[in-house]
């Protein structure tokens, strides 16, 4: 069976790999699987997209596929991924679909599904859709005549979502100056409206999408321009979102970049103080900084590690009934409010902590001392056997001994590329780079491409 779904839906180069034909089939078969699972003859489906030029093309094809199975489709227009997840749940829809490739370049696009509960589909549901995709025109229902349903626009859904986000905090943000970077994506209009409505003084960059400039040297994967703007405008802090608004990276008043680990620590510390952190636990991935775990330990907060990927964080949170988790990359899940990483929600919560504490972000984040980190990608012939390679393990053991507990090693295969990622954290930049290079050289020697 062909594997269409990755860790975050179906992605590819728009009109080449992710074609309108495939989008039609995903709509038709995805609509059928979810309608069948929910016991709905005429499922309600919400469809949102980011600002990519290919979004409208794929949206039209997807909606046609959904309509062909008898779905009642409501178009949300440009909205964030977590906005789709929230509205799917809130409006009692059987299915939510987001058309976006998140932080990827403009040429890419993707389609991800949310079930009626607002969570991404299970592996079993994705496999059911893939089975239908592999069949040649499977025999599925085809409504005709009056059984075909109109689709409608529900662009006011974005406002409903923003009103909800505003209700998650008890303070306004008057007196705070915040610079916002919308990555020329889904949050370009949403973020300025939300933070302005909360009475913050806002400056913006990356909030002028033209269909082609999404994530182009802006947003959470390029926070350097935001750092410059924060200093230039003397803002209290800056918030950078990614193309579909499910990530957040911050910048403090001194221009320092504050990553997902630090944001989770600041918010988690406040939740713990207020006895709002379920089981005194934060869920993170193996990529979180060693300094993150040490800072949590100092605060009496427990941690739980998962594989890289926000879906694994969410799985662990649901299993243990935890309400805060996320990734260093800025996917932060606050389960009390939403079912997926939500950059706007995280930004609002972080801003509320800053406002209520009366402390600058630099001071709040400084309680977590980050260990210098070095990451090297090595192209290999077979990424899946790196953990079994005795020579690589021997060098890793030697480095562990030399670090004497003041560092961490992570060697893992990439989830999407023919790469092995070597990550080392150590007490100094020099040590982190030296140790990472030593391990990477061994991986290259034993497993690398000629």
Curated annotation (Swiss-Prot):
Protein source organism: Staphylococcus haemolyticus (strain JCSC1435)
Keyword Isomerase recorded: yes
Protein name: Phosphoglucosamine mutase
NCBIfam families (UniProt xref): glmM (TIGR01455), PRK10887.1 (NF008139)
Pfam families cross-referenced by the UniProt entry: PGM_PMM_I, PGM_PMM_II, PGM_PMM_III, PGM_PMM_IV
InterPro entries: A-D-PHexomutase_a/b/a-I, A-D-PHexomutase_a/b/a-I/II/III, A-D-PHexomutase_a/b/a-II, A-D-PHexomutase_a/b/a-III, A-D-PHexomutase_C, A-D-PHexomutase_C_sf, A-D-PHexomutase_CS, Alpha-D-phosphohexomutase_SF
Cofactor note: Binds 1 Mg(2+) ion per subunit.
Enzyme Commission number(s): 5.4.2.10
Stored Gene3D superfamilies: Alpha-D-Glucose-1,6-Bisphosphate, subunit A, domain 3, Alpha-D-phosphohexomutase, C-terminal domain
Role noted for this protein: Catalyzes the conversion of glucosamine-6-phosphate to glucosamine-1-phosphate.
Record field: catalytic activity: alpha-D-glucosamine 1-phosphate = D-glucosamine 6-phosphate
Molecular function in Gene Ontology: magnesium ion binding; phosphoglucosamine mutase activity; phosphomannomutase activity
This protein's record includes keyword Isomerase: yes
Active site (catalytic residues): 102
Enzyme class: isomerase
Modified sites of kind Phosphoserine: 102
Keyword annotations from UniProtKB, A to Z: Isomerase, Magnesium, Metal-binding, Phosphoprotein
Family, as annotated: Belongs to the phosphohexose mutase family.
Posttranslational modification: Activated by phosphorylation.
List of residues binding Mg(2+): 102, 242, 244, 246
GO CC annotations on file: cytosol
